[in-house]
């Protein structure tokens, strides 16, 4: 019988992008704010958006300052999100060797800063992940590929990666499970944002009905199906006289609100090394109305997951009328309540979290 998991509470600074971009906080100040609010102990950053000069410009002086800061405020680096920018060149896509070199620099910085995990992205193929395994071994960093809508745990691309992981049998290869893949409704806060942009109620009703229909059909298991759904949102906006909203509907309706059922995570659960607690808002009842946070936490606990959950508030893209710190506070309260209801607890003590995270990442995949 699997022992109950004890997930580690944490947050990604991505949740506070609006405040960071508005220069309300610099990196030092935002990390201190996170610690003071009790949003840790887990701390996740995105390399290119949080760290000036990433990756080549990260010198030893900055590394020392960063490590000293997180030690001072008693936070634990959990995951550094790194990018797979295969299309960064104007003339062609990166070739295999260029991609490995590009990723290697970022993985090295993750290790220097003290992050045990580098979140990588779905555009990495099984062959690329296999080529990066020696890099992961060199630096002692787990590569956790993010499973993000429109993909999900049972998507063909994800299963191909899982099968390669099983063949390679290394604890340094795994997944970051992003809860946006398993959403149960169109976010009310986004509908409100569309209202504020002048969208008619009838159009919003049709958007919700279209998404609900895709939810009933089940998740897209191929890129072809995803493309058809993407186009359906664009067509709806055009027919309704709001073509300016078409791409917005499509990106959010397919790329943020994934309609996969929760049990699709079971296809890859043994390889889940990190979790993005993706959510979009907290309602007047103190709950997330479109992401089944309680069920997701229970699933992790019951399957023995003891890694970090980085609360990832994505509603900042459109919600400029609510405080993201209040919203994170509310969502983490839901996580703690859900873990308790499942017979366990979220880990909020830094010393205990360090021990548990080290053990979680050291375990064989099927240990």
Curated annotation (Swiss-Prot):
The active site is at 148 (proton acceptor). Optimum temperature is around 40 degrees Celsius. Mg(2+) binds at residues 146, 178, 276, 312. Optimum pH is 7.5. It comes from the Bacteria. Its EC number is 4.1.99.-. One of its GO terms (molecular function) is metal ion binding. InterPro entries: Xyl_isomerase-like_sf. Keywords: Carbohydrate metabolism, Lyase, Magnesium, Metal-binding. Activity is strongly reduced in the presence of chelating agents. The keyword Lyase applies. Gene3D superfamilies: Divalent-metal-dependent TIM barrel enzymes. It catalyses: 3''-dehydroisovitexin = 1,5-anhydro-D-erythro-hex-1-en-3-ulose + apigenin. Its cofactor is Mg(2+). Carbon-carbon bond-cleaving enzyme which participates in the metabolism of C-glycosides. Acts on the C6-glycosylated compound 3''-dehydroisovitexin (3''-oxo-isovitexin). Shows weak activity with 3''-dehydroisoorientin (3''-oxo-homoorientin) and 3'-dehydromangiferin (3'-oxo-mangiferin). Belongs to the C-glycoside deglycosidase alpha subunit family. Heterodimer composed of an alpha subunit (CarB1) and a beta subunit (CarC1). This is C-glycoside deglycosidase alpha subunit. It comes from Arthrobacter globiformis (strain ATCC 8010 / DSM 20124 / JCM 1332 / NBRC 12137 / NCIMB 8907 / NRRL B-2979 / 168).
């Amino acid at each position: 019988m699997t022992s109950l998991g004890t997930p580690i509470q944490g947050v990604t600074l991505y949740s506070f992008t609006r405040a960071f971009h508005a220069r309300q906080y610099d990196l030092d100040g935002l990390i201190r704010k996170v610690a003071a609010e009790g949003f840790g102990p887990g701390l996740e950053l995105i390399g290119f958006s949080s760290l000036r000069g990433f990756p080549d410009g990260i010198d030893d002086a900055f590394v020392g300052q960063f490590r000293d800061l997180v030690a001072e405020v008693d936070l634990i680096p959990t995951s550094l999100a790194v990018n797979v920018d295969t299309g960064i060149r104007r003339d062609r896509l990166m070739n295999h060797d260029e991609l490995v070199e590009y990723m290697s620099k970022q993985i090295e910085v993750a290790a220097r800063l003290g992050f045990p995990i580098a979140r990588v992205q779905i555009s990495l193929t099984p062959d690329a992940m296999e080529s990066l395994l020696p890099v992961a071994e060199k630096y002692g960093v787990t590569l956790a590929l993010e499973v993000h809508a429109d993909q999900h745990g049972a998507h063909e691309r994800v299963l191909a990666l899982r099968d390669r992981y099983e063949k390679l049998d290394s604890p340094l290869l795994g997944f970051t499970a992003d809860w946006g893949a398993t959403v149960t409704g169109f976010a009310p806060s986004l509908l409100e944002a569309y209202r504020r942009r002048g969208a008619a109620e009838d159009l919003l009703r049709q958007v919700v009905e279209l998404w609900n229909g895709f939810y009933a059909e089940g998740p897209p298991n191929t890129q072809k199906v995803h493309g058809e759904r993407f186009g359906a949102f664009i067509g709806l906006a055009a027919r309704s006289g709001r073509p300016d909203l078409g791409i917005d509907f499509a990106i959010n309706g397919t790329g943020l609100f994934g309609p996969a059922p929760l049990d699709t995570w079971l296809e890859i659960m043994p390889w889940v090394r990190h979790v993005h607690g993706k959510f979009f808002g907290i309602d007047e009842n103190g709950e997330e109305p479109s992401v089944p946070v309680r069920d997701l936490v229970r699933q992790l606990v019951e399957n023995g997951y003891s890694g970090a959950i980085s609360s990832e508030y994505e509603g900042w893209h459109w919600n400029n009328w609510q405080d993201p710190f209040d919203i994170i506070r509310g969502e983490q309260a839901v996580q703690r309540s859900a873990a308790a209801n499942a017979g366990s607890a979220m880990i909020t003590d830094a010393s205990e979290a360090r021990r548990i995270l080290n053990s979680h990442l050291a375990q064989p995949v099927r240990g």
